[in-house]
Amino acid sequence: MSAYRREADYMIEDGALPHEVDEAMTNFGFPMGIFAMQDLAGLDIAWAMRKRRAADRPADERYVEIADRLCEAQRFGRKSGKGWYDYSQNKSGITDPEVTALIEAEAKRKGIKRKPIKRKEILKRILMAMQKEGQQIVDEGIATSGGVIDVVMINGYGFPRWRGGPMFLAGLT
């Protein structure tokens, strides 16, 4: 489900920081946040895919270039010692002021005035992105019900089992 990754990207461009998004997710019950997960998987994998799909991206679609800038700086995540977080001194990663500066510079370049986003709002936006995309998948007939989406989110994406799934939370099962 790429929708919640995109929403997380929008939030860091709009005013949140990666560790704030990740903390909102882990406090909710995810085993790790989206940015820590990207660092674990390797930022270069998604970067290669984004480059392949660039020509097909709608011109009017918002595109956040921050992850691309990290990759251009050879920050591929844990495998390179730096990504969204700095792993050079701590295997679990620490917030890196270089990433914060890069985020702020990219937002400024695009004319975005960053404003802090509260953790409650971060979580709401992440869940709404999951729910909207999940409903679209059901509407297109790709999945038979919201319950199927929840099973995938719990077993494949680490959604906290005891929460029931994003579709369950929205009453869409």
Language model features with spans:
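N-terminal glycine-rich phosphate-binding loop for ADP-containing cofactors
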Residues: 1-173
